[in-house]
Structures are given as C-alpha cells and as structure tokens.
Amino acid sequence: MLYHASQTGNIRVLEPKVSNHNAPLIYFSAKRENVLVYLSNAVEKYCKETEFAHNGKWHKWASYGFEPDGILRLDEYYPNAIKDTYKGVSGYIYCSNDIYETESDIKINNVVATSEAVPVVSVEFIEDAYAEILKAEKAGLIKIRRFEDMSDKMLAWIKNTIKSEYTQAENEPDYRYFLKAKFPFLSADC
C-alpha cells in the first residue's frame, strides 16, 4: 500500500500536479507516517491566519530529513514550529496500489512518484495532524528534533540557511513574510 496526503476531501482519482521538481507528479510514500508532514504548509497556514494577501502559488516549507535508519525526522527551526504548523489541521490520507512509477530519480526516502492518474483504494480522515504526528513519534515511527534541543552548531546553520533563503526569495512575498515573522533576527539583518 502507498500513501498520499491532502487537505482536499472526496478524491476518487489522484491527478498529477506541478511539483517542486517542476513536473506534474503525484508523490506517494510506502510509510503512512511519512505523509503526515504534507497535511499542512507552514507558510500558507501562517499567511492565511494573519490575512496576508497572496494570489500566487504558496512557497512549500518542509523542515524534515531522515535518520540513518530511514526514519523521518521533523526539525523545528523556530520555537513551537510543529505545533504552529499542524495543530488543528485536518486532512486525508489516500491509499493506492498498482502505481506505475514514472520518476525514479526522486531522492526522497520511501517515495514513489508518478506522472499518471492513480485511483484511490481507501481514504483515512485525519482530524488533527499535530495529534497524529505526536502519536507517530510516541510509537517510534518518526522523530522530532525540537528547537529547544538544537545544538549551537545547528542553530547557527539554521540562521545562515534562513538568511540565504530570505535573500533568494526576492520574488516570493509570502515566503519572506513568513520568514520575517518566524525568525526575528531577519528584521535586524534585512
């Protein structure tokens, strides 16, 4: 079984959408817990909650990686990032099988990508993505590296990375708005 997350309900057939890889694709994971991170986008959620006017495509924010053993690790780049991003967010996990993998060069652990429409076999409603993420953490299925547990070296890396991201986001007002709100050091430096 392969899993795909969406905030959109009542999908019978998953259709490819233009992705971060600049091609129409649908991404699936062989691990249900790994798709939980796609139930919310921190940039979009924050901008909507604060009534930031934006007409274009929302910048995708994803601060996760994988442990050497293949377990997904969520990283909090700012205090309470995971709670802010996922608490109160509902969505759906769609299950499919018999997927024809058309993109084999996607370098994300346990991910299968296809450019073809895929029928949905079953669906699970997730009432609160944050609660579900914490449940997966407790079960040892994912790891969370909380902001307050970050090393000084990691905090310095985050600061440098965010400054670079801000500079490169010249044409992404939604992303810059989000970054300035969540990383106060940008206000002093930019």
Model-derived features: positions:
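Surface-exposed, glycine/proline- and aromatic-rich loop segments on solvent-exposed faces
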Residues: 24-28
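Short, conserved phosphate/pyrophosphate- and ester-handling motifs at nucleotide-, phospho-/glycolipid
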Residues: 31
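Conserved NAD+-utilizing ADP-ribose enzyme module
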Residues: 42-190
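ADP-ribose/NAD+-binding catalytic cleft of ART/PARP-like enzymes
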Residues: 1-23, 38-41
